[in-house]
A protein has these predicted regions:
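Intrinsically disordered, low-complexity terminal and linker regions
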Residues: 1-236, 338-358
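Segments that shape or occlude catalytic/ligand-binding pockets
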Residues: 4-28, 210-358
């Protein structure tokens, strides 16, 4: 059998004696052997999450992620294997600041994981693409790939009936009901508290362990811990809960303002602009419900930036040493303060806040 991944295969029967001949013929015609990349999934289910509000949260985020995958890919999650994800990541890691070469890589990516596209050219880069445009495409494809990978990792295994999805992921999510804690969260949000709906305390064991190991290793103190915001579209939130905010050491560094790092904001308003909330400034959200992350981060000697220069696009952990973060101040270059972290062990999840359009 042969055909596109995700489509019904074209089946013909031939004698085994002509296998090698037919195989070589199809390979020469441009077909690719995907046998080792395909996978078979089970139809088990997870144990139900007990808390109603947490169950509704995870269900909503799964639905948002699933809808994004269905609207972008012509293959389902069950038809994608870990090997295909790895191969797709390898393709993304090869991106440069050369639009022609990058378009060739995009075509390879679309062949590996077929997309729903009326016109492929609409998803490619213009010949004169600026670094920021290239970075936007890299971010677009990386987000979709992480969504797909997270949905795959959410597929139940044989022993799933004994665990909830959160237990499988070493993740704890509990609603914040303490009035003092709620007041503190809202006060920190400032005027943005007008769209506060509810908050959940998040404990990701893997990211927490990395954070506290880094904290101890570098002799940080309590006063070095800061709580800043990170906004993302609804479709990305499940992946962030599962993985945290992680950096890919092989990722191409093309068009980031202060280099490739984790970008956080001291003001909720700045990060809300990146969420799916209706009218959000940066991504033009259209949803009445959106989510904002509060990240716990640690640093004690930030590199302060008051005026941006083009050389700052190539900032890295080693280049800002002995500083351990970038604090870019609002002013001539930025509307709002921004914090950039270059080691993902310095950041872990604290809260996910539900926002409602008022």
């Amino acid at each position: 059998e042969m055909g596109r991944v995700g489509a019904a295969p074209y089946v013909r029967y031939y004698p085994l004696s002509v296998w090698d001949e037919m195989y070589q013929k199809k390979i020469s015609e441009g077909y690719q052997d995907k046998t080792t990349l395909m996978d078979v999934r089970s139809s088990n289910t997870y144990k139900e999450i007990e808390d109603d509000s947490v169950r509704e949260l995870i269900s909503f985020l799964q639905q948002e992620s699933s809808m994004a995958i269905k609207s972008n890919y012509s293959v389902s999650v069950s038809e994608v294997s870990p090997q295909m994800i790895t191969q797709a990541e390898d393709i993304l890691n090869q991106f440069t600041d050369n639009p022609r070469k990058d378009n060739s890589l995009l075509e390879q990516l679309f062949a590996l994981l077929p997309r729903k596209m009326k016109n492929v050219a609409d998803y490619l880069l213009p010949a004169d693409a600026e670094p920021e445009q290239i970075q936007n495409v890299i971010d677009r494809e990386t987000d979709l790939l992480r969504m797909m990978e997270t949905q795959m990792q959410a597929l139940p295994s044989n022993d799933s009936k004994e665990k909830t999805l959160l237990e499988e992921w070493n993740l704890s999510i509990t609603p914040v009901n303490n009035e003092k804690e709620l007041r503190q969260i809202k006060r920190h949000m400032g005027h943005s508290a007008d769209c506060f709906s509810k908050a959940f305390r998040v404990k990701n064991s893997n990211r927490d362990n990395a954070f506290w190991n880094y904290y101890d290793k570098h002799n940080y103190h309590k006063e070095d811990i800061h709580y800043w915001y990170h906004g993302s579209r609804n479709m990305n939130c499940l992946s962030i809960l599962h993985n945290g905010l992680i950096l890919n050491p092989k990722a191409p560094k093309v068009g980031h303002m202060f280099g490739y790092g984790i970008y956080l904001a001291p003001k909720a308003k700045k990060s809300i602009g990146y969420t799916s909330l209706n009218g959000s400034f940066w991504v033009h959200g259209t949803s009445d419900t959106a989510y904002l992350f509060v990240m716990k981060t640690v640093y004690k000697s930030p590199y302060h930036v008051y005026t941006w220069t083009s050389g700052m696009k190539s900032l890295t952990k080693s280049r800002i040493s002995p500083h351990d973060a970038v604090f870019a101040h609002a002013g001539t270059s930025l509307r709002n303060d921004e914090v950039v972290i270059f080691d993902d062990a310095q950041v872990t999840l604290q809260y996910i806040i539900e926002l409602k359009q008022q």
